[in-house]
Amino acid sequence: PKFYAQINYTELTSSLKLRHPVFLGLREDKFFQYPNYSNDELKTFLTSPNKILYPRHKITKFDIASYYNEVYPLIRQHLIGRVLNLYRCPKGVGNNCFFNRHRGSMRNLVPIQVKNQNNFTVYDLKGLIYLVRYNALEIHTWNCSKENDFAPKEIVFDLDPAVSLSSQMVIEAAFEIREILKRLELDSFPKVTGGKGIHLHVPLSAAYSQLQVYDISKSISLLIEEQRPQLYTTTSRLKDRKSKIFIDYLRNNFGSSYICPFSTRANENATVAFPVSWQELNKYDLKDPLTLMKLISKAPVKHPWRDYWGLDQRIKIYK
């Protein structure tokens, strides 16, 4: 966003849509800026801001909130309105952490009803900071939002390598899969997960059902496996994954989730799931992932997926 618009409307619906909107023109006296809280304001949203959640590096709740405060302009389009799952660690990383898929007592989050389940989302920076308040060390998103009637916004291919594979082998595999997707007229964007793997995000036109997107993600994954069965597998059984890269297409099943770009990870080194350009990926060392400590001192200001948001890609088989 770059400008403010003045709009009259009769009411705001429960899904945050304007009823009977009338565009009155642009505001020439105001220019758009993303919200950014002061340190004192951040602390008012947090319970126990000095609580240490990453003991090894003495990273506090406030440190995590400060990081999200800075990267909000970059994370917002991956996060806002998406159905969310959280990995929460109230006692810090490694101590009785748990996945949270339902809103429950997290009253500051926006409720979303999905098949009679009380799920949740956030719509602004304050909501993101509240996730930190609830000790969320990982933010996982679904591939959809209520605003688009839960039509998938992207396909994600999760490349989960065996520990024996080198960083370079995994990166070369990502480039190989990129070329396969290109032949299907699909551009993809890499994200290092903060662990040993890579996610490839493929933006989509919101024109397909959840079942269509799941089926095509499975078909493409099987195609990749068929081309190099000695390197790729779509089987989740550990005994079948030795010295191979597991392509987890199940991330695209309705109700499944994957780590949000720019989210912290719940490990002792406080790594971060980070989107990178293909040029950056070629130089990346998956054995030395990006950490929150590095980003706290120098937060990114530009999104590396420059062309991601303008793509309206269609799945060839369904055109």
Predicted regions and their residues:
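Catalytic palm subdomain of template-directed nucleic-acid polymerases
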Residues: 201-213
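Short, contiguous, pocket-lining structural segments
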Residues: 169, 192-194, 212
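Basic, nucleic-acid-interacting segments
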Residues: 70-168, 172-174, 178, 182, ...
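C-terminal accessory nucleic-acid interaction domains of nucleic acid-metabolism proteins
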Residues: 1-66, 76-81, 134-155, 161-167, ...
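Short, conserved phosphate-binding/catalytic loop or strand-edge motifs used
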Residues: 192-202
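Short beta-strand
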Residues: 86-90, 188-194, 235-239
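Short, well-structured alpha-helical interface segments that form or flank functional binding sites
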Residues: 63, 172, 195
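Non-catalytic alpha-helical scaffold/packing segments enriched in small hydrophobic residues
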Residues: 176, 199, 216-219
